[in-house]
Amino acid sequence: MHDNLPQIWEKAINLIKTELTEVSFNTWVKPIQAISLDNETLVLGVPNDFTQGILNARYNTLISNAVKQVTSKNYEVHIVVPSEERVGDTQNINARRSNAQSPIMGNSPLILNPKYTFDTFVIGNSNRFAHAASVAVAESPAKAYNPLFIYGGVGLGKTHLMNAIGHYILANNPKAKVVYVSSETFTNELINSIRDDRNVEFRNRYRNVDVLLVDDIQFIAGKERTQEEFFHTFNALHESNKQIIISSDRPPKEIPTLEERLRSRFEWGLITDIQPPDLETRIAILRKKAQMENIYVPDEVTAHIAKKIQSNIRELEGALIRIVAYSSLTNSEVTVELASEALKEIFTSKPRLLNVPLIKEVVSNHFSIKLEDFDSKKRTRSISYPRQVAMYLTRELTDLSLPKIGDEFGGRDHTTVMHAHSKIVNEINSDSDLKNKLDAIIKELKSD
């Protein structure tokens, strides 16, 4: 770093400040950190890709001119999103990330996300038990709960907790071999190993570890060879007293076409779920996001967003970034009115996300059956009829193909789905009670 860089940058931002509104300056320029300055190039660090894009598009020339005024020299300005260890006083994180990457062979398994730690996880009633279980496993791998199975909808924090477990273990035991992988990557690596006759290398990669974290395990359902390989991998690790952490969008008993021997093993340890966050947790998540990204958003605005968006954390955070961008691009103060304007398309046009687990849940409540009955082989009318109704609704309200719908209902053939759909369509015309019941179910599914 140039010895005078802090002084040069301080003078430059004072000049920049006179050219911008307070909102724009605080949102885009204030978070910038001066990283290095050589004979030709000034490197500036920003907290995220979004900020980088805005600065490059709108403010790069302004920054260059300000630096030129201070130094009487033309510098090329590079705006980057540095790895976490280069921003601020985080030397320990540098060591941890090196260790996090060391056990990962090639470029196949995933690298732990440095932002996903226990410190950045917002705890609420919807995720408190899952968080506590994750901490327990991180503190005592293979001693507390093995395996740990975390399930929940998209964007609720499963991946965050899995990364946090990996980071915590590595921070306390830098020599630990931690591998984090998606089930899709596991499958692709298996296929490649079979093709290239490298089965031994593949098995060593996933069986000679201390901690194995597998994301989205539901995608191995229906893949016989993958399930076979994962079954033996699971056994090898469990017998060696190594920790296994698994995530899914549903509990083991509701994963269609999952082999029973795997299902039973997933249930050996602890199964915990994450629910959509309540209002207080959503507000806390937004405040944490604003703090992490160094952006200012009034409390009444975060409360407004939290009341309007109830689905998942990703949409909450996306709405926050959209509002801040809208504020900057229109040179307007962040207010509730501005937030409503920025998000009006989301609020007015986005329907509730419909999926099979939600449809099953609502139908099971209306017909008083258990969720597992949808995937069972039971053929009594009290079970088969609600199952047909759920298949009909899935066909009508989602974009899933007939074979995929069959998979979601215990691995049934697509012709079974076609029959169920046709049966309900025909009965609607002659059975007013059924039509009224379906209308009530659909209304509940589409309600906020």
Swiss-Prot record:
UniProt keyword terms in alphabetical order: ATP-binding, Cytoplasm, DNA replication, DNA-binding, Lipid-binding, Nucleotide-binding
Record carries keyword ATP-binding: yes
Stretches for region Domain I, interacts with DnaA modulators: 1-85
Main location: cytoplasm
Record keyword DNA-binding present: yes
Subcellular location per the Swiss-Prot or TrEMBL entry: Cytoplasm
Annotated binding of ATP, by residue: 155, 157-159
PROSITE patterns: DNAA (PS01008)
Span list, region Domain II: 85-110
InterPro entries: AAA+_ATPase (IPR003593), Chromosome_initiator_DnaA (IPR001957), Chromosome_initiator_DnaA-like (IPR020591), Chromosome_initiator_DnaA_CS (IPR018312), DnaA_C (IPR013159), DnaA_dom (IPR013317), DnaA_N_dom (IPR024633), DnaA_N_sf (IPR038454)
Gene Ontology biological process terms in this record: DNA replication initiation; regulation of DNA replication
Region of interest (Domain IV, binds dsDNA), residue spans: 328-448
CDD domains assigned to the protein according to its UniProt record, in alphabetical order: AAA (cd00009), Bac_DnaA_C (cd06571)
Listed GO MF terms: ATP binding; ATP hydrolysis activity; DNA replication origin binding; lipid binding
Protein's job: Plays an essential role in the initiation and regulation of chromosomal replication. ATP-DnaA binds to the origin of replication (oriC) to initiate formation of the DNA replication initiation complex once per cell cycle. Binds the DnaA box (a 9 base pair repeat at the origin) and separates the double-stranded (ds)DNA. Forms a right-handed helical filament on oriC DNA; dsDNA binds to the exterior of the filament while single-stranded (ss)DNA is stabiized in the filament's interior.
Name the record gives this protein: Chromosomal replication initiator protein DnaA
Gene coding for it: dnaA
